[in-house]
Amino acid sequence: MAASKAKGKLVSIVINNEYIKICEITKSGKNSVVHKTVTIPAPEDCYVEGVIEQTDVLAKAIKVVMDEHRFNANNVAFSISSPRLATKEVLIPNVKANKIDKLVQANATEYFPVNMDEYIIQYTVLEKVEDQGQEKIKLMVAAVPSEVVESYYGLAKALGLKVAFVDYAGNSTYQIMKQQIGPEVSLVIQVENDGTVINIFKDNVLQLQRNVPYGKSMLVNAVMEKYGLKLSLIHI
């Protein structure tokens, strides 16, 4: 899902049907320096189950904010959140790093019972483990519809930016949390408007991650229906 391994300054953008988070950072090795960050409401009907719709409308809203706050990076990184994204933990033989991708792609249909021609596969190496006396590599494998990824590339083009990489929200959460938790078993829940990512860590390693297609909007709608409230009266 990566397009170019950009270093230096870039814009990081997270989009859902509730808000857009825009952050300008400088990457140097494993370190990142945050220069500025802005959150704005998402235009209506521009985000549908992870797919960017009405690209021109969305690009215009983002450009206005970037110009106002003087963002000047030329590269963009997207973090995708979609109920259509699936993840699975898998064990593979202890092969060299440059052999992992080929092995994952070859076995993708065993991980996910979908038409792989319509999906893009990405993986994250979690740890090396011993399984039945043999050393193996534990991976977190993600499958995201090509339609979703392509819509983000279309947005980048409309913004006049070059795609540095496209990641999925679960991996972004994992990369942050593994630096902040200890060896104890930890449950990390990331609740968004229309989806929730559940993570279980042990010994600072991700053991399980699942995307649930239910979020804050379901709870809000239930409260509104039960008590006859309007959305403007509910503070989320």
State the predicted function of each range.
Residues 1-234:
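Hydrophobic/aromatic-enriched cytosolic interaction surfaces used to assemble or bind macromolecules
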